[in-house]
Amino acid sequence: MKGQQKVADIEEGTVRVQEEGAVATGEDPTSVAIASIQSAATFSDPNVKYVFRTENGGAQVMYRVIQVAEGQLDGQTEGTGAISGFPATQSMTQAVIQGAFTSDDNGETDASGPETHYTYFPTDSSTSVGGTPTTVVTTHNSDTLLGQAASTGTGQFYVMMSSQDVLQGGSQRSIAPRTHPYSPKSDGPRTTRDDKRRAQHNEVERRRRDKINNWIVQLSKIIPDCSMESTKTGQSKGGILSKACDYIQELRQSNLRLSEELQNLDQLQMDNEVLRQQVEDLKNNNLTLRTQLRHHGVEIIIKSDTH
């Protein structure tokens, strides 16, 4: 890229990458800082996330970046980590560089600070100076650029810092104040509501019992056997109901007998009507015969039995 210079210092074991005054140094003699840098505004991968953070309240902006492959890490040892996000035929490891990258002169490891910064570089890039660029971390007072190689890295960039630092960098959402004072729940309203419901239920039950008692009293007045006993000894409700059932059975049987008698009465009335008609016919025949006898000169003597 234009305006970038890569200077390798083999004797001191450090490599510096300069970009318009921005310098990144590595303390590990086997590590290499990559010089292929892209602008943050034209970053190729939209999923890349980065966080700005000043060191100790200063004006410098420091990037802490780690590239992690999508695959699962295996075969880890102290100081190195294996990346499994590359093709099966290519196995790569990462060298861990511990220290803060602040300026060109400050290249020593700071292990006694309040927090430790880690930056991971692929091993194949640290073995040779002319290797394929993968990641770079630069620090500058006014402008800082972060680049990514477009060749082998398939993982995402992750910022390693505490959750408090991440939350401090973002915008905090203000919570609306409570418009009314908070009152803790108490058992008073619930108890009052339960008492009111219980009282209403008791009132409904009382009215229902009163209606049943009134109906039983009416039955005791209708039934002949209970009318006198209820006034003297106070007939029980069960006795009144049992006698009412017996009385209803008797009434049903009486109704059946009455219906049968009515049918017999109807039959008798029909028979009586037939007999009356026959009597009328006989009277007419008798009168006709008497008329014929008189016409022929036969005297008719009617004898009556007299004692």
Curated annotation (Swiss-Prot):
Keywords: DNA-binding, Nucleus, Transcription, Transcription regulation. It is found in: Nucleus. Residues 268-289 are annotated as: Leucine-zipper. Residues 187-207 have a biased composition (Basic and acidic residues). InterPro entries: bHLH_dom, HLH_DNA-bd_sf, USF. Residues 104-131, 168-207 are annotated as: Disordered. GO terms for biological process: positive regulation of transcription by RNA polymerase II. Pfam families: HLH. Gene3D superfamilies: Helix-loop-helix DNA-binding domain (4.10.280.10). SUPFAM superfamilies: HLH, helix-loop-helix DNA-binding domain. GO terms for cellular component: nucleus. Residues 196-251 form the bHLH domain. Residues 122-131 have a biased composition (Low complexity). May act as a regulator of transcription factor IIIA (TFIIIA) gene expression. Efficient DNA binding requires dimerization with another bHLH protein. Binds DNA as a homodimer or a heterodimer. PANTHER family: FI24210P1, UPSTREAM STIMULATORY FACTOR 1. This is Upstream stimulatory factor 1. It comes from Xenopus borealis.
